[in-house]
Amino acid sequence: MTHLTQQTEAELLVQKQLDAYNNKDIKAWLDCYHSDTVQLDFHGFVLASGHDQMRQRISVRFTEPDLKATLLKRMVMGEWVIDHEVIQRNFPEGRGQMEMLCSYQVKQGLIVKALFQAGEVVLF
């Protein structure tokens, strides 16, 4: 088994994507994704497919004033990067947070698939 101490290209790309998310920078965020990327939940339900649907979905999210993702842990295995995050959001019920598992498949320098599993919402 090889232990890497340097960040991989996949890990750097996913961090760039997370930074763009926290900066609410749609262009920088989309630039991390292949134009045909599919975003799914862990049960296989398609959340968005391609840049147009992703832009539409994230544009709404980026209007939330308290939106912020905090990375708790990151694991990398080859082309897969898995993040455990806490997401602070403005839910319809009020301000709160939830844990999120985010799994990103990176090929040729872009995210080609993203899987998400949300935990329970805790309101403040």
Q: PLM ranges: what are they?
A:
Residues 2-4, 9, 19, 40-41, ...:
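A beta-strand edge to alpha-helix "cap/lid" segment located at domain peripheries
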Residues 14-22:
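Regular secondary-structure segments
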Residues 23-37:
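Short, well-ordered alpha-helical segments enriched in acidic and aromatic residues
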